[in-house]
Regions:
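Active-site lining segments of carbohydrate-active enzymes
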Residues: 380-448
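Short sequence/structural elements of tandem HEAT/ARM alpha-solenoid repeats
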Residues: 327-333, 387-392, 452-460, 496-504
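Positions within ordered alpha-helical repeat solenoids
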Residues: 317, 377, 399, 403, ...
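Carbohydrate-recognition beta-sandwich/jelly-roll modules
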Residues: 2-392
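Long alpha-helical HEAT/HEAT-like repeat alpha-solenoid scaffolds in very large eukaryotic proteins
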Residues: 499-551
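Inter-helical turn/loop segments and adjacent helix faces that build the functional surface
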Residues: 381, 448-452, 489-497
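Well-ordered alpha-helical segments within folded domains of soluble proteins
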Residues: 298-320, 360-379, 429-444, 475-491, ...
Length: 551
């Protein structure tokens, strides 16, 4: 006797209702997909089917106390269907639109007007793959990516048996800001689930002996869901095809969104003001060994080489664009040599006189290579001093890469390669995208010297990251540099493989972006739309990581 499959009450109830049959309300088609709208006991559903290839059940409206009445309303614009659904707690208006200009998709928006101040202790998920006989318990497939933290509310999966294809579910969290404000909640990892119960789990106040009482207001229309569901006929594929498909499907969803209006900023004036502040503010700089160095943070932390090189590279770019000399940049460059370890032949993170509260031998893996990237940038622009430091550090950079098998830990001792921190959490993964950054540095070395062995090192690093799929992103800017490295390798070698591998880096990068405009807390005071969160599990955006990704 086979082992019973564990399932939630919601999944079992749906399975039973589909077997018995629901009350049909409407039907329309989307390519070879038929979409039946039906009323169950406590929900109204859209059942999307492909002939003999399975389907998908989408919960359009959850009705506490049961579905009292469903009426079809007049549609407007691109709407396929508009419904008014009544239940014990009030009225919900559901609109369904469709588009197949690039990839077929439907958009389902549900607006709830409660008849009384409504506490929401729980709302069920809204997406169920359907197997043979419309049974969600017989659906076989795999989730490739789901929402991380407060990033985009998406889940990307494929239904293999039956061969329905791939699905990208994208919850437009921007439309739900009123719901979050009324209930005092955040959509933290709200889109995901355990197969086959997937989709959006609306956030609710934490439950306890004395739970918060933050109701949805009576008589006020509040959007509780604005879901975009994109379909693709293909399902199982290698990581490159899967990544490209994800980007295509995400692009189809993105085109349906109302992006924030472009605002004018005088970036040139801001750049000049920032330069003045760096030069004049005593909190910005510190003197060591007779040289000027930039503080990593305002009036705090010891100077480190990554910060110095990032500032110098940016100042060089601005000087070239403005066609003017910036003496402050040259002043900073004069102190770079103190970071170079002549014995190890590498750029060290800290100056030799760093305080005892720091481990002068400890280095995060990406800190070893990011300064070299900016040195390479200056070297390729003709800076002889930068070239000397860059080329003088390449052998050690390669030695470290080979020692770790092109799979770097979080932190290690620079003199012995002793690992200090192996993994970011219990998944055993280190800084998974450092290989992309290393590859970019190796491509720079190849362009500077013409030596094929540097190109070979770049290839090895990219190859070592195969099959990381959506776990590739450790830190946003490193993933972005990895995508750029793949594109450089493609142009140099003319090998299609590297173009395809760039999609893996890009897919992992965009998986970690917030494609919505939050009005929660302090976020209401600034734009976060399409911002990249700094780390794979970070609940914040950082100016450096965002700007470096853009660069």
């Amino acid at each position: 006797m086979g082992r019973a499959i564990a399932a939630s009450a919601a999944t079992i109830s749906l399975s039973v209702e589909l077997a018995k049959g629901m009350r049909k309300i409407a039907q329309f088609s989307l390519g070879d997909r038929t979409i039946d709208i039906a009323a169950g006991q406590d929900s109204v559903w859209a059942i999307v089917r492909r002939p003999n290839r399975g389907g998908l059940a989408v919960r359009l409206a959850h009705c506490w106390g049961g579905v009292s009445d469903v009426a079809t309303l007049r549609t407007t614009g691109k709407e396929c269907l508009r419904l008014r659904v009544r239940s014990a707690v009030g009225e919900q208006v559901v609109t369904i639109g469709s588009d197949d200009m690039s990839l077929p998709l439907i958009r389902v928006t549900t607006v709830l007007t409660s008849s009384t101040p409504l506490l929401v202790p729980y709302l069920p998920r809204d997406l169920y793959p359907l197997g043979k006989g419309d049974d969600p318990l017989r659906a076989q497939g795999q989730v490739e990516a789901a929402q991380r933290g407060l990033n985009s509310g998406l889940i990307y999966f494929h239904l293999d048996r039956p061969a329905f294809g791939s699905v990208l579910y994208f919850q437009n969290l921007t439309a739900l800001n009123d719901y979050f404000a009324a209930t005092g909640t955040k959509p933290d990892s709200a889109v995901g689930g355990e197969w086959p119960e997937l989709g959006f789990l609306p956030p609710t106040p934490p439950q306890s002996g004395t739970p918060p009482t933050k109701p949805l207001p009576a008589g006020r229309a509040v959007t509780v869901s604005d879901a975009l569901i994109v379909f693709h006929d293909e399902a199982v594929a290698n990581e490159q095809n899967s990544a490209r498909r994800f980007l295509q499907m995400l692009g189809a969803a993105y085109r349906q969104l109302a992006a924030p209006a472009t605002k004018y900023h005088d970036w040139v004036e801001r750049s000049r003001r920032t330069l003045r502040n760096l030069e004049r503010a005593p909190e910005a700089t510190i003197r060591h060994y007779g040289h000027t160095y930039i503080h990593p943070y305002t009036a705090s932390e010891y100077p480190d080489v990554m910060v110095q090189m990032s500032i110098i590279s940016a100042l060089r770019n601005f000087a070239a664009w403005a066609e003017e000399d910036i003496p402050f940049s040259k002043a900073l460059e004069q102190g770079l040599g103190k970071f170079h370890d002549r014995k190890l032949k590498t750029m060290r993170r800290y100056l030799p006189n760093v305080g005892r509260d720091k481990d002068k031998l400890a280095v995060d893996s990406w800190y070893l290579y990011h300064p070299l990237l900016n040195l390479g940038h200056l070297a390729l622009a003709g800076d002889r001093g930068a070239r000397r430091l860059f080329e003088g550090s390449l052998d050690f950079a390669i030695k470290a890469a080979r020692h770790f098998g092109y799979r770097w830990p979080i932190q290690f001792k620079v003199d012995t390669f002793e690992v200090i921190v192996e993994a970011r959490n219990d998944d055993g993964l280190g800084q998974t995208d450092v290989g992309g950054l290393f590859a970019y540095v190796m491509v720079q070395a190849y362009e500077l010297t013409g030596r094929q062995d540097y190109l070979t090192e770049a290839r090895k690093a990219i190859d070592a990251a195969r099959n990381m799929r959506f776990e590739l992103n450790y830190q946003a800017n490193l993933t972005a540099w990895g995508a750029a490295a793949c594109l450089r390798l493609w142009r140099i070698t003319d090998e299609e493989y590297y173009l395809q591998q760039s999609y893996v880096y890009l897919a992992s990068f965009f998986h970690n972006t917030a494609i919505w405009e939050s009005q929660i807390g302090h976020a209401k005071h600034y734009d976060v739309f399409l911002g990249a969160t700094a780390l794979h599990d970070a609940p914040y955006m950082a100016i450096f990581e965002c700007s470096d990704s853009f660069a």
